[in-house]
Amino acid sequence: MEEKKVNIREMTMEDFEEVHALWMGIHGFGIRSIDDSKEGVERFIRRNPTTSMVACENDRIIGAILCGHDGRRGCLYHVCVHEDYRKQGIGQKMVEACLAALKREHVNKVNLIAFKKNDIGNHFWQGMGWTFREDVNYYEYV
């Protein structure tokens, strides 16, 4: 079996349509029309130009992570890999690339939100050694 060559690189706004299509193709993926609109993602990328990543095979985007920080703490959003490419280490490589980008900006602490019903995602984060926090409550103002 031929090994697929996957390239991890910084996400740019030129990637938006393909990344958005990837998000929309994943069952149960949580998208917000305001934050995840082209304008919302552009604002995010402009603020964090070097920290979000895509995984590409033959110029086709098969994975993506929005990653940013506020100068103190990083956050990962919309971590996803196309279903046909899972369990090949692609998600882990993208996360490692994001963490390296954050480290270059002197950000060492990173958070993320995984929905309770997202068994695949929760298993992934536990497998990567991330700590599940039971000592905090998460609040949101929309």
Regions found by a protein language model. Give the residues of each.
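Conserved GNAT acetyl-CoA-binding A-motif
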Residues: 102-114
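Conserved beta-strand in the GNAT
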Residues: 54, 60-68, 75-77
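A conserved beta-turn-beta hairpin within the catalytic core of GNAT-like acetyltransferases
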Residues: 68-77, 86, 132-135
